[in-house]
Amino acid sequence: MIVDAQSVKNTDSAEQKGYDAGKKVSGIKRHIAVDTQGLPHAIAVTTANVTDRDGALAALDRCKANLERVESVLVDGGYTGQPFADGVMERIDATVQVVKRNELHAFVVLPRRWIVERSFAWLEKCRRLWKNCERKLNTSLQMVHLAFLRLLLRRS
């Protein structure tokens, strides 16, 4: 399983928003846990001021019954720390593997991390998800679910 978060800007009509100081985005964050095919197994939408670690744990909490067979979770450098690893172990009994970025500051495709980035790119094909125009976080979450359902229906 591969976990990542995406910050999305808000429109003026959105009620719930936070500020992600790392990416300088005022809006929401989408936390997604995908399998090796890029299909989502856990999704959470939070305000942007929620850390990646807390949002990922919230996503895993929502779908813990479906994640019984997961053995390891691949994450990027934003998820380092023993409390996150302990939280994953407690929730789904899986180990955490942190994929470190290249220190040379050159663009390098991180192994197996591109899968979750591709899933975010699939979401960006839905024009409604380019920005968060929903008033409630739950509505944004349901729009992400609908986008992935549309993708799955087209593939079958």
Spans of features found by a protein language model:
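Polybasic low-complexity intrinsically disordered regions
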Residues: 1-93, 97, 101, 147-148
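Basic, amphipathic alpha-helical segments enriched in Lys/Arg and hydrophobic/aromatic residues
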Residues: 86-87, 91-93, 106-156
